Amino acid sequence: MVKETIPKEGENIKIQSYKHDGNIHRVWSETTILKGTDHVVIGGNDHTLVTESDGRTWITREPAIVYFHSEYWFNVICMFREDGVYYYCNLSSPFVCDDEALKYIDYDLDVKVYPNGKYHLLDEDEYQQHMQQMNYPKDIDVILRRNVDILQQWIEQKKGPFAPDFIKVWRERYKKLRQKS
């Protein structure tokens, strides 16, 4: 049995995403924890090494704040670019944390949000393909579709990680923690 742990502020952790079949999908080598509770983990990273399932690696281009919630089937990456904040939202299982990493299952569907507030649902073809290949249960599909709706409401209502104050508060906290280290 895996013992769940709650990451502490200032701690550096790995983030591991998996596919439904249990195979590793992607690993972010280092994210600094800004807030860790039973329900929410908020972290920050910048120029972080990412390893893909096939072994390829790349480095993130900009500072980002990541948001995970234990009750919702999505996570949000807030990326700070010259022309504004972009959001990349992964439809995924709720997160779990253990001594190794923060972990979740990536379910292919993504929502990209632009600085002007417009957003698009991405990768529906990949989702349909993997749903058949990996035999996603029908109730997973229902949960994910419901969470797409919740995510769209959050975006439109500027709730949670889409709230302007969220960005200000957590970006500042990340900058201060980086200065200390």
From Swiss-Prot:
Catalytically driven reaction(s): a ribonucleoside 5'-triphosphate + H2O = a ribonucleoside 5'-diphosphate + phosphate + H(+); a ribonucleoside 5'-diphosphate + H2O = a ribonucleoside 5'-phosphate + phosphate + H(+)
Superkingdom to which the source organism belongs:
Bacteria
The UniProt entry, under Pfam families, shows: DUF402
Keywords, comma-separated and alphabetical: Hydrolase, Magnesium, Metal-binding
Q: Where is the active site?
A: R26 (proton donor)
Where is Mg(2+) 2 bound in this sequence? D108, D110, D123, E126
Q: Does the keyword DNA repair apply?
A: no
Coiled-coil positions are none
What positions does the entry give for Mg(2+) 1 binding?
Answer: N90, D106, D110
- Describe the family membership recorded for this protein in Swiss-Prot or TrEMBL: Belongs to the Ntdp family.
Q: What does this protein do?
A: Has nucleoside phosphatase activity towards nucleoside triphosphates and nucleoside diphosphates.
Cross-referenced PANTHER family, in alphabetical order?
A: PTHR39159, UPF0374 PROTEIN YGAC (PTHR39159:SF1)
Q: What is this protein called?
A: Nucleoside triphosphate/diphosphate phosphatase
Record organism: Staphylococcus carnosus (strain TM300)
Q: What is the lineage of its organism?
A: Bacteria, Bacillati, Bacillota, Bacilli, Bacillales
